[in-house]
């Protein structure tokens, strides 16, 4: 698979036009609170890069009974699938948290295309990635490979056939730090082109038709 760079650039611009600048993105405190808005009882869910599978418990707390499947190349925990290419079935929701930045850009595109193919029509994909406007979030981990700006991630998803439904900055901190970073220091951050939010979360839908 190769990337059509001109089309990716156009989809990036379309994403920026839809959501504005990084500082225009609304703030949510936790990724699972975003997820909770986009599912319900009986949903079939695939988590890619599932780690210890603890996300399943959060889903059950929110929605009750769900069909949860996990995929991870790390054999530390037992998973339903060892690679996204091995995944079978169709899903209402596919999630990948803090995963895509560990891939090359080509592999990232392969992953979102594969996610699109595994979703039911009208199904939802939710991804998070470090916010490149908050440099420590990406730079502090040597296993991070590809920094993805919010419009770049949106462009990849649009290029794969998704429609973007929502995009947020994720930020949770003490009240004192929130006051300092979100209000007192905000003009300085914006002037020098950085942000206080550590992650970006994107909600994308596979069109019904």
Locations of the language-model features?
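Conserved N-terminal segment of class I S-adenosyl-L-methionine
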Residues: 1-95, 106-113, 118, 151, ...
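Short "lid" loop at the C-terminus of a central beta-strand within the Rossmann-like core
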Residues: 51, 130-135, 147, 170-174
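A short acidic, helix-capping loop that chelates divalent metal ions and anchors anionic groups
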Residues: 77, 134-139
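Short catalytic micro-motifs in class I SAM-dependent methyltransferases
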Residues: 97-102
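Conserved beta-strand signature within the Rossmann-like core of class I S-adenosyl-L-methionine
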Residues: 122-129
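Acceptor-substrate binding/catalytic loop of class I
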Residues: 137-156
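Substrate-binding/catalytic lobe of Class I Rossmann-like enzymes that use SAM or dcSAM, i.e.
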Residues: 159-166
């Amino acid at each position: 698979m190769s990337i059509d760079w001109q089309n990716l650039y156009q989809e990036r611009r379309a994403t920026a036009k839809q959501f504005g600048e990084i500082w225009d993105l609304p703030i949510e405190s936790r990724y699972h609170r975003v997820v909770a808005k986009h599912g319900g009882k009986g949903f079939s869910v695939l988590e890619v890069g599932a780690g210890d599978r603890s996300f399943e418990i959060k889903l059950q707390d929110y929605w009750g009974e769900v069909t949860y499947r996990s995929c991870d190349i790390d054999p530390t925990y037992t998973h339903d699938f060892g690679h996204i290419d091995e995944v079978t079935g169709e899903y209402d929701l596919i999630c990948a948290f803090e995963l895509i930045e560990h891939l090359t850009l080509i592999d990232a595109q392969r992953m979102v295309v594969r996610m699109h193919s595994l979703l039911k029509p009208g199904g939802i994909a939710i991804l998070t990635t470090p916010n490149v406007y908050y440099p420590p979030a990406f730079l502090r981990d040597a296993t991070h490979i590809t920094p993805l700006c919010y419009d770049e991630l949106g462009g990849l998803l649009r290029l794969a056939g998704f429609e973007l439904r929502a995009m947020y900055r994720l930020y949770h901190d003490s009240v004192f730090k929130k006051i300092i970073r979100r209000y007192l220091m905000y003009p300085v951050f914006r002037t020098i082109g950085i942000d206080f939010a550590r992650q970006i979360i994107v909600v994308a839908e596979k069109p019904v038709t």
